[in-house]
Amino acid sequence: MGASREKKQQIVAEFKDKLSKAQTVIFTSFSGLTVEDETVLRRKFKEANSEYKVYKNTLMTIAARELGYGDDLIKYFEGPTSVAFGYEDPVAPAKILTEFMKDHKGLELKVGIVNGKIVSPQEIEALAKLPSREELLAKALGSMKAPITNLVFVLSGTLRSLVYALNAIKEKKQAEA
């Protein structure tokens, strides 16, 4: 019995660690998914530097209480519950799950935690519609690059006009001579 208790304590510690490190945590009900569906979903999470796991509800309850979460989160730990962790991009888990739910009706959002705040399934779906971190960085870089590019075009246009004007003056002087 001691080894089983130690194993459970390790699982609680692992879950607490993941819950603390993740920017986004989404709890789902997966009762209608096949093992093959779960494998595909895990692979998608791995590709996005995220994680998808199943924990026992009782162990998640212990870990959540130890981290200071109350019944507003723990009440969702009923029935088959899986957990998606997003470490780098807070939008990635929401995007993966909502996209996967379109083709797999057995997967349902229960509740989420985004940067320590408990969020509803509707808020998770809204989060999924936001651009990813990489997309936002690309847009920011593009908007910073645009004024510089425009300045280059304006300056090169001005220089080009100056060259044409000087060339015209040169040709006029040569024609007069």
UniProtKB/Swiss-Prot annotation:
Family annotation (CDD domains): Ribosomal_L10 (cd05797)
Entry keyword RNA-binding: yes
GO biological process: translation
Entries under SUPFAM superfamilies matching the protein: Ribosomal protein L10-like
Subunit and partners: Part of the ribosomal stalk of the 50S ribosomal subunit. The N-terminus interacts with L11 and the large rRNA to form the base of the stalk. The C-terminus forms an elongated spine to which L12 dimers bind in a sequential fashion forming a multimeric L10(L12)X complex.
Protein role: Forms part of the ribosomal stalk, playing a central role in the interaction of the ribosome with GTP-bound translation factors.
Family recorded in the similarity comment: Belongs to the universal ribosomal protein uL10 family.
Identification of the protein by name: Large ribosomal subunit protein uL10
Annotated source species: Caldanaerobacter subterraneus subsp. tengcongensis (strain DSM 15242 / JCM 11007 / NBRC 100824 / MB4)
Underlying gene: rplJ
